[in-house]
From Swiss-Prot:
<keyword id="KW-0963">Cytoplasm</keyword>
<dbReference type="GO" id="GO:0004309">
    <property type="term" value="F:exopolyphosphatase activity"/>
</dbReference>
<feature type="binding site">
    <location>
        <position position="8"/>
    </location>
    <ligand>
        <name>a divalent metal cation</name>
    </ligand>
</feature>
<comment type="similarity">
    <text>Belongs to the SurE nucleotidase family.</text>
</comment>
<dbReference type="InterPro" id="IPR036523">
    <property type="entry name" value="SurE-like_sf"/>
</dbReference>
<feature type="binding site">
    <location>
        <position position="9"/>
    </location>
    <ligand>
        <name>a divalent metal cation</name>
    </ligand>
</feature>
<dbReference type="Pfam" id="PF01975">
    <property type="entry name" value="SurE"/>
</dbReference>
<feature type="binding site">
    <location>
        <position position="91"/>
    </location>
    <ligand>
        <name>a divalent metal cation</name>
    </ligand>
</feature>
<dbReference type="GO" id="GO:0046872">
    <property type="term" value="F:metal ion binding"/>
</dbReference>
<dbReference type="InterPro" id="IPR030048">
    <property type="entry name" value="SurE"/>
</dbReference>
<dbReference type="GO" id="GO:0005737">
    <property type="term" value="C:cytoplasm"/>
</dbReference>
<protein>
    <recommendedName>
        <fullName>5'-nucleotidase SurE</fullName>
        <ecNumber>3.1.3.5</ecNumber>
    </recommendedName>
</protein>
<feature type="binding site">
    <location>
        <position position="39"/>
    </location>
    <ligand>
        <name>a divalent metal cation</name>
    </ligand>
</feature>
<keyword id="KW-0547">Nucleotide-binding</keyword>
<keyword id="KW-0479">Metal-binding</keyword>
<dbReference type="InterPro" id="IPR002828">
    <property type="entry name" value="SurE-like_Pase/nucleotidase"/>
</dbReference>
<comment type="function">
    <text>Nucleotidase that shows phosphatase activity on nucleoside 5'-monophosphates.</text>
</comment>
Length: 248
């Protein structure tokens, strides 16, 4: 069984090392990841320049592109390796609620799913680096169950691991996406030349962390698994939209 692994934090990140190390105990692994941090690039493709694929001393491959680029290259370049599954992560920081629309970690899994490959995105609800032991232990539990009876149908799962001590993880919950408030305004500044520049402001506060949401359950110490879908059609609004446009 072959697993292609990518992320958006780059091939040198601690999270992808943990994910590759644990997954290798269950399957054949190939890592194709961005050469640097590409957080927040969502499903973007590199179209304005050619891409290069290189191999690091640890055996990981890296690309001067986005996570989505990495999935395309990983599935196209290697004649000796075709993925049965794609794993993305482990992201340094959560990917919950609206974050999933921006996340390169989730995007790598999404791109694989669009190719017909079952895919899982993994994130740790912590950016401090204090809880990698929790992430690794959780991953052992998750993958032991996953590979015992691997999913047969196409899946796209978003998994978030709580920022608690390993012994304090309370189990697994299936959760829906929560919501954030609108992000904060851009921050104006001046560069050393006195020119006007702008920084994108911080993300908004969580507005929906009710029981059953990824924000709520992961914050309470549970590993959350959220099944995602690609179809963005608002089916309940179809009739109202047709009436507005006087269309069928």
């Amino acid at each position: 069984m072959n697993v292609l692994i990518s992320n958006d934090d780059g091939y040198l990140s601690e999270g992808i090392a943990v994910l590759a190390r644990v997954t290798a105990e269950f399957a054949n692994v190939r890592v194709v990841a961005p050469e640097r941090d590409r957080s927040g690039v969502s499903n973007s493709l590199t179209l304005e320049r050619p891409l290069q694929l290189k191999q690091a001393q640890n055996g990981f491959y890296y690309v001067n592109g986005t996570p989505t680029d990495c999935i395309h290259i990983g599935q196209s370049v290697f004649s000796d390796f075709q993925a049965d599954f794609v794993f993305s992560g482990i992201n340094r920081g959560a990917n919950m609620g609206d974050d999933t629309l921006y996340s390169g970690t989730v995007a790598a899994a999404t791109e694989a799913y669009l190719m017909g490959i079952p895919a899982v995105a993994f994130s740790l609800n912590d950016a401090s680096g204090r809880y990698w032991a929790t992430a690794e232990q959780a991953l052992w539990t998750l993958l032991a169950h996953f590979f015992k009876t691997p999913p047969q149908s196409p899946i796209l799962w978003n998994i978030n691991i709580p920022a608690v001590a390993p012994e304090d993880v309370r189990g697994i919950k299936i959760a829906r996406l929560g919501r954030r408030h609108h992000g904060q305004n851009v921050i104006p500044a001046r560069n050393p030349r006195g020119e006007q520049i702008y920084w994108i402001g911080p993300v908004g506060e969580v507005s929906d962390r009710e029981e059953g949401t990824d924000f709520g359950e992961c914050g309470a110490g549970f590993i959350t698994v959220t099944p995602l879908q690609i179809d963005l059609t608002a089916y309940p609004d179809m009739a109202e939209t047709a009436a507005f446009w006087h269309a069928d």
